[in-house]
């Protein structure tokens, strides 16, 4: 149960997850003040929410703490760490995102050590090695870490968890970790969103009078995938903030329905007024790609326990590589026409997450995670995946990122 008059701080305020947390906290009458941190201000906030432009990566903890003091960031009870910086290799991801968390926690301890109760960290299903290939299903929180000696690469989620373990040890504050997957949501000025990319793809297909083919492969289309709606993640993180049993624990947080793209894709097609063609996987395309992942599939860590033979490295197979599709002149021209007609961002194609969606849709293995751990502690909410996409598309229209019709 939420306590009255608590003070929260949220990092990554302009991202999908951070923005959703801020909105959810603002709806909680028990929350007195919300401090939000990002490098730039991309939204207008009500009086209850205080924005602070702070660079967590390039400023020392003592300098961040000084800014906190000067700007009235004090008496923090609950800290939500949703900041993230993309890098082009795993070592750099660990260094950069680890340092941001470390700097933030040290600054908090310098200014709010007497009042801080819990840090709520957002990581993801990459914890299970999902980015490396096929994993053991369903993914449950007691699954082992993927050793670096096995994968050949570090994992920044492990780095961040270890930082919180180290800093909270022997202190009055603790931590808890939420692990979503493929977040669907909206934040003003943020395009790190598969829903936005899907919308761009559908709108250009409509403009060109071309079919709305699933760009991945038939196996994944007919298989299963877990998505996390940002509103549900935020609601879950508020729940875990005050749940004593969540102390020093991590939890999967996905929509909780049984989701297959073979159900969702036709509904998205109907929403945008495009058609899924018959026999959509029967034709060979010049834009098709097939990549074998360089790391062993993490399911092989359980080879002996499961009594299975060695699983080969997983493949990413796309009948249409969106990275190649978006480079076509006809696609660029079509979006330019749409943008001029509807008064939209003419450069939207440049910020679509095409590479990410190639990986997402091209997977040849299922993505299924268990919510049992949270369910056993009383969290029962879920969200229909298509409803989450629909609400996201509707919000993208309101923000004039995509056409109204």
UniProtKB/Swiss-Prot annotation:
MF (Gene Ontology): oxidoreductase activity
Pfam families: PRISE
Disulfides per UniProt: none
Superkingdom of origin: Eukaryota
Membrane-spanning parts: none
Protein name (database record): Uncharacterized protein C757.02c
Lineage of origin: Eukaryota, Fungi, Dikarya, Ascomycota, Taphrinomycotina
């Amino acid at each position: 149960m939420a306590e009255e008059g608590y003070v929260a701080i949220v990092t990554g305020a302009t991202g999908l997850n951070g923005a959703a947390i801020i909105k959810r906290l603002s709806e909680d009458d028990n929350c007195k003040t919300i401090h939000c941190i990002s490098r730039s201000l991309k939204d207008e906030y009500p009086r209850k929410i205080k924005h602070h432009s702070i660079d967590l990566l390039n400023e020392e903890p003592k300098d961040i703490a000084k800014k906190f003091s000067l700007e009235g960031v004090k008496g923090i009870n609950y800290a939500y760490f949703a900041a993230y910086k993309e890098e082009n290799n795993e070592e750099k991801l660990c260094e950069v995102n680890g340092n941001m968390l470390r700097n933030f926690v040290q600054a908090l301890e310098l200014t709010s050590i007497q009042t801080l109760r819990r840090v709520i960290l957002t990581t993801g299903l990459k914890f299970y090695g999902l980015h490396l290939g096929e994993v053991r299903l369903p993914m449950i929180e007691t699954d082992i870490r993927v050793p670096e000696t096995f994968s050949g690469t570090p994992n920044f989620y492990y780095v961040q968890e270890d930082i919180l373990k180290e800093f909270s040890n022997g202190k009055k504050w603790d931590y808890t970790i939420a692990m979503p997957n493929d977040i669907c949501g909206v934040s003003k000025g943020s395009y790190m969103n598969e829903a936005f990319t899907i919308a761009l793809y559908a709108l250009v297909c409509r403009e060109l009078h071309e079919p709305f083919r699933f760009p991945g492969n038939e196996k994944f289309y007919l298989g299963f995938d877990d998505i996390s709606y940002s509103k549900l993640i935020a609601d879950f993180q508020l729940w875990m903030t005050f749940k004593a049993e969540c102390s020093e624990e991590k939890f999967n947080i996905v929509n909780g329905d049984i989701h297959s793209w073979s159900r969702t894709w036709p509904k998205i097609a109907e929403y945008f007024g495009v058609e899924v063609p018959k026999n959509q996987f029967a034709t060979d395309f010049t834009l098709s790609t097939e990549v074998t992942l360089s790391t062993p599939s993490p399911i092989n860590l359980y080879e002996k326990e499961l009594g299975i033979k060695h699983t080969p490295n997983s493949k990413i197979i796309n009948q249409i590589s969106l990275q190649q599709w978006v480079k076509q002149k006809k696609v660029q021209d079509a979006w330019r026409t749409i943008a001029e007609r509807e008064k939209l961002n003419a450069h939207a194609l440049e910020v679509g997450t095409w590479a990410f969606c190639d990986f997402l849709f091209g997977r040849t293995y299922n993505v299924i995670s268990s919510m049992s751990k949270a369910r056993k502690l009383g969290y029962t909410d879920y969200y229909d995946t298509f409803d989450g996409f629909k609400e996201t598309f509707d919000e993208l229209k309101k923000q004039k990122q995509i056409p109204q019709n």
